[in-house]
């Protein structure tokens, strides 16, 4: 069975006879957090006299939000491509005193990414495509390193901020994710933590001899030269490329109990 990813449409498919409906890890996690209703929020913001969007039409607000989203996506794609390109310039790299081969992603001439053999040898895997057929669950980890019997995963994030707590209401109560992970605050750091933990779970399922090691988020912040009319940053460019201001590391725990609960929920609720 070959599992593939098509960038256009962001589609995962396989050539097996089971006709699996694949679910990406990010989409799966999205099931357990409140959905953002952009149209409803734009309408509300337009009428709120204390909002910076007051007096603008719903369409103008939505267009401003979409422009900012596309700007952020562009920065994220640039950084991911830059890191992958830099890594693939080498055949090997030293990690924890060991010289490891760099394993390149399998991409066809048509730009389709093919998932590799899931039994992993010691090495560094940029943009590793992982999947678990039994669940129909798949995803792509920015950087996986298999070294000294451990699975180390790093993911790059370029969004404006990393929030460590959910929204706090006037009673001091923070918003939570949905059951079965309603013990976690609904914030993007916890979303990322679950994402990396599920990647680790999938890899370990195929490689039971390995232990789960470091799970790291690299949060990349870019320099800005000012802000636009809506208060969004205008990125500083140097020689035609975004200028990086800071990279902050978040070392995250493996959320074993939460992942086990999510996997159990998925098995019970998965629609094949």
Residue ranges and their predicted role:
Residues 33-40, 160-170:
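Internal, charge-rich low-complexity segments
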Residues 131, 159-161, 206, 222-223:
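Short, solvent-exposed loop/turn segments at secondary-structure junctions
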Residues 185-193, 197-272:
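Metal-dependent nuclease catalytic regions and adjoining charged, substrate-binding loops involved
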Residues 80, 139-165, 172-178, 199:
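Conserved catalytic cores of phosphodiester-cleaving nucleases, focusing on short active-site segments
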Residues 136-138, 151, 244-247:
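Short, mixed charged/polar active-site loops
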Residues 1-138:
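Metal-dependent nuclease catalytic cores that hydrolyze phosphodiester bonds in DNA/RNA
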Residues 68, 177-189:
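Short histidine-centered catalytic/ligand-binding loop motif
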Residues 131, 144-146, 218-220:
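A generic structural motif
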């Amino acid at each position: 069975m070959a599992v593939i990813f098509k960038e256009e449409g962001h589609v995962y498919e396989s050539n097996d006879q089971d006709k699996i409906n694949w679910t990406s890890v990010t989409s799966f996690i999205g099931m357990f957090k409140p959905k953002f209703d952009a149209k409803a929020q734009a309408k509300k913001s337009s009428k709120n006299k204390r909002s910076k969007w007051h007096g603008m039409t719903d369409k103008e607000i939505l267009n401003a939000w979409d422009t900012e989203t596309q700007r952020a996506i562009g920065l994220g794609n640039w950084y991911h491509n830059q890191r992958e390109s830099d890594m693939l310039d080498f055949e090997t790299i030293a990690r924890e005193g060991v010289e490891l081969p760099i394993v390149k992603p399998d991409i066809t001439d048509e730009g389709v990414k093919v998932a590799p053999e899931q039994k992993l040898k010691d090495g560094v895997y940029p943009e590793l495509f992982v999947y678990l057929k039994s669940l129909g669950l798949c995803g792509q980890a920015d950087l996986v390193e298999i070294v000294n019997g451990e699975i180390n995963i790093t993911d790059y994030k370029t969004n404006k901020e990393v929030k460590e707590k959910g929204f706090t209401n006037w009673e001091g109560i923070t918003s939570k994710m949905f059951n079965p992970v309603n013990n976690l605050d609904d914030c993007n750091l916890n979303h990322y933590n679950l994402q990396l933990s599920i990647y680790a779970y999938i890899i370990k399922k195929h490689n039971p001899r390995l232990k789960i090691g470091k799970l790291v988020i690299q949060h990349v912040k870019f320099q800005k030269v000012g802000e636009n009319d809506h208060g969004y940053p205008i990125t500083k460019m140097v020689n035609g490329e975004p200028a990086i201001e800071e990279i902050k590391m978040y070392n995250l725990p493996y959320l074993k109990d939460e992942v086990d609960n999510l996997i159990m929920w998925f098995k019970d609720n998965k629609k094949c």
